[in-house]
Amino acid sequence: MAQASACIDVAVSADIVWQLIGGFNSLPPWLPYIPKSETTEGGRVRHLANPNGGTIVERLEKFDNAARSYSYSIIQAPFPIADYLATISVHQKAGGSGCLVDWSATFIAKGVSDSEASKLFQGTFEDGLKALAARFAPSRRVGLSAHSVQ
């Protein structure tokens, strides 16, 4: 099983960040490479358009508004992976001085090495979190890791 994860400091409260990213259909306002998102199945499935005209279909697996977190799986995508499960969460920092946003996923690489698949999502998560932080203030730190677990 392969994995990728990223974390970034954002200089505003967790509640403010969650207002922007906490909806399962809320990617286009903050994620530049997803210009369009439409939901089906009562909002539990989202169909994402990417700039190349491709479609990614994702299913909401778990949503916890109080914890500011949701998990989703990929149903259909042009990526070399299977059994993808990701979580996005927002955590208030102690003292109320901003928040941490975490985005992580586990998956099985298909037709490529675990490292290659991890790099794909590592870049996606890093770029996405940088774009998110830029909406509020310059980012102070991006910590990113990608791991392959045999």
Describe the predicted segments one by one.
Residues 14, 53, 122-125:
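A structural signal for well-ordered alpha-helical scaffolds and beta->alpha junctions
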Residues 17-21, 27, 46, 60, ...:
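Hydrophobic pocket/interface hotspot
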Residues 100, 106-150:
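A conserved amphipathic terminal alpha-helix motif
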Residues 1-41, 150:
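Hydrophobic ligand-binding cavity/cleft-lining segments
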Residues 42-44, 67:
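Short acidic/glycine-enriched loop/turn segments that link adjacent beta-strands
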Residues 36, 51-100, 106-110, 138-139:
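Hydrophobic-ligand binding "helix-grip"
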Residues 30, 81-83, 114:
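Alpha-helix N-cap/helix-start motif
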Residues 44-51:
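Short aromatic-glycine motifs in intrinsically disordered, low-complexity regions
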